[in-house]
Each structure stands twice: as C-alpha cells, then as structure tokens.
Amino acid sequence: RRDESWVRGAVCEQYDRIQVPVLAVSGWNDCWPNTVLRLLENVDAPCRGVSGAWGHVYPNLGVPEPGIDFLGLALAWWDRWLRDIDNGVMDGPPLLAYLQASHSPTPVPSARPGRWVAVSTWPSPEVSVMTLHLAPHCLDETTVVFSEVKVFSPVWTCLTSGEYMPIAGVSELPEDQGCDDALSTCFNGPVSDQVLELLGTPLVHLRVTCDRD
C-alpha cells in the first residue's frame, strides 16, 4: 500500500522540491532504470541524465560494458555547480543513452553491443509511443476483447531472470528464460524482420483479481 511512509521518501511525489542541479545516472540492468527519464521530464532545475548498459555500479566500472568517464563527468559537474566554473558541462546533451542491440542471453556481464545516442530533449519528439494490446496468448496492435486469462505461477518461476540488483560483477544477469516462459502466462507478438529501437519507460495497464488469500 502506498501510504505516507512511502510518499515521504518518494521523489515522484515532490518534484517541485528539487531546486538544485541534478546529474542523474543509472544503467538499464540496474533496478531503477526509469528514474533518470522521470527526473529529466519533471525537474525544473538544470538536469542531465546518463543511462548505460551497466548494473548497480558506478559507470566508470562499466559492468556490463561499455563504461564512461564518470569521474571526469562528475568532476566537471561539481566544478560547474559547486565552484561556479563555466566549463561547458551543460553544453552536452540532456540525455546520453546507450541503445543496446539484440544479443544472445548470457548471465555473464560482458560488453553489450549497441551505440550511444545523444537526445536533445526529453520527452523526445523523435520517440513515438507504441501501444500493444493483450490478446489470448499474444500481442496485437488492435484492441481485442476477451474475457479473462487465468494465471498460475509456481514459486520456482523466474529462476533464470537474474538478480534484481546486479552489483557483484559475476553471473547475475538474465540467461535463457525459455524454461520460465514454459511456467508462465505469456503474451508474445509475431516475429518481425523490422528494426525496432526502444528508448523510454514501458507502461502496462492490468485489471487483476485473486481467488486466494
């Protein structure tokens, strides 16, 4: 339940209280990958964001790779906002994001293929929203009316999903999750031969009921 104990420490409940410059950094394999984008979208103070491939580690460690010169970026940021040195750190893109390419699943934090993109504003007019509707055991771009889907997930489901907060630099990332799919209720879209680049925060709307305590 989202009561006052959660609201008190939640940034999303009080963006207007953030009045200092913000350098937001996270990784797509971290447990908080969406925070950077939300800060860029809602904070009125000077704000820049960096989202890389790494997990819950400093970007200069870069696990998974590629890393960045985070120490240099942090030093330039502090020189600008703590020492009032006009060093052009705000001339960089508001969002620097690593677009990961498709790769075979491996829990080992090796280098991830992809490329860095500089995004001039967020939300970006170059990013469009794609809506996919749940249909019986599939995804569809058109609305499909169906009554219900029953879900029963054994407690041992998701053993191959990886750690929630990968930090140790060992085999913590998702591996082939075919065995978990076999135990799950899945909604899969058709195989596409078109290039699809994803950048943003996924959102799902569900209506859920439970017949057990």
Language-model features and meaning:
Residues 1-90, 96, 102:
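Active-site-proximal cap/loop segments of hydrolase catalytic domains
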Residues 64-213:
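C-terminal, loop-rich substrate-recognition/catalytic regions characterized by aromatic stacking residues
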